[in-house]
Amino acid sequence: MTPSLANFLWSLLYGAVVLGLLFGAIVFVSQRDRVRRR
């Protein structure tokens, strides 16, 4: 595996992790908001 390909795969992995954290935070906040409004 070439270094550039390895860097590309790592950037994809980190991008997926960041998106997952953002999505998880949005879902968590929306769930809490719904409970508080009721």
Swiss-Prot record:
The keyword S-adenosyl-L-methionine does not apply. It is found in: Cellular thylakoid membrane. The keyword Transmembrane applies. Keywords: Membrane, Photosynthesis, Photosystem II, Thylakoid, Transmembrane, Transmembrane helix. The chain crosses the membrane at residues 8-28. Pfam families: PsbX (PF06596). InterPro entries: PSII_PsbX, PSII_PsbX_type_1_subfam. It is a single-pass membrane protein. Disulfide bonds: none annotated. It comes from the Bacteria. GO terms for biological process: photosynthesis. GO terms for cellular component: photosystem II; plasma membrane-derived thylakoid membrane. Gene3D superfamilies: Single helix bin. Belongs to the PsbX family. Type 1 subfamily. PSII is composed of 1 copy each of membrane proteins PsbA, PsbB, PsbC, PsbD, PsbE, PsbF, PsbH, PsbI, PsbJ, PsbK, PsbL, PsbM, PsbT, PsbX, PsbY, PsbZ, Psb30/Ycf12, peripheral proteins PsbO, CyanoQ (PsbQ), PsbU, PsbV and a large number of cofactors. It forms dimeric complexes. Involved in the binding and/or turnover of quinones at the Q(B) site of photosystem II (PSII). PSII is a light-driven water plastoquinone oxidoreductase, using light energy to abstract electrons from H(2)O, generating a proton gradient subsequently used for ATP formation. This is Photosystem II reaction center protein X 1. It comes from Synechococcus sp. (strain JA-3-3Ab) (Cyanobacteria bacterium Yellowstone A-Prime). The lineage of its organism: Bacteria, Bacillati, Cyanobacteriota, Cyanophyceae, Synechococcales.
